[in-house]
Amino acid sequence: MPVTDAIAQSLPIIAVSNLIKQFGRFAALRGVDAEFCVGKFYVILGDNGAGKTTLLRALAGLAHPTRGTISIQGKTPQEACRKIGYMAHPSLLYDEMSGIENLRYFARLYDIAGDERCEEVIRAVGLDPEMARAVGQYSQGMRQRMSLARAILHDPKILLLDEPFSNVDVHSAREMVGLLKGMRDAGKTILVVTHQAALLEGVADEFVWMQSGQIVERTREPGGEHSGAGTR
């Protein structure tokens, strides 16, 4: 029987079981259990130190669990790395290169030939691919947009974005939200760590609240029981 779009979007693309991550005696993640489904937009909220970034890094394959498992359609994050686009905070860009030079470098890692895709994603985030200025001379908002371009360059199925709207003006942030909404509508799974939940109200499918290394609440709206945390 064929899998319909509705059925596909109810299937988990990411499954996390009893995820623990310790740094010495400090437990950044304390037994996280969660599933994230195909084509859904999730916002991860919580105070600083709640474990949000550590969870995102673990899902991206950059923080190895002390205990527990992460399955991305039956594979580890490392095995599924080409399905994942990760935007770090602060950004992972080469300051001495221009934006297009940065993307050319990463395009080679993904076996993407030519400049067409690089130019496409730069325009998609509202920047000019002809801009010769080195990334080190960008404003913080421009760096964030170029970091998003890097994350979507290889057309991943999953986007893991850490504070994508930090230091971005409201108009540009709304443009970025519109781009992400379109990608979600096209079937991508998106997880965003942010302190700006209001930007994503009416766009996100679910708000995931973290506290002391655990997921403590999942809601359809940003005003959950723990809404005082991580939304400022």
Whereabouts are the PLM-identified features?
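H-loop/switch region of ABC-family ATPase nucleotide-binding domains
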Residues: 194-195
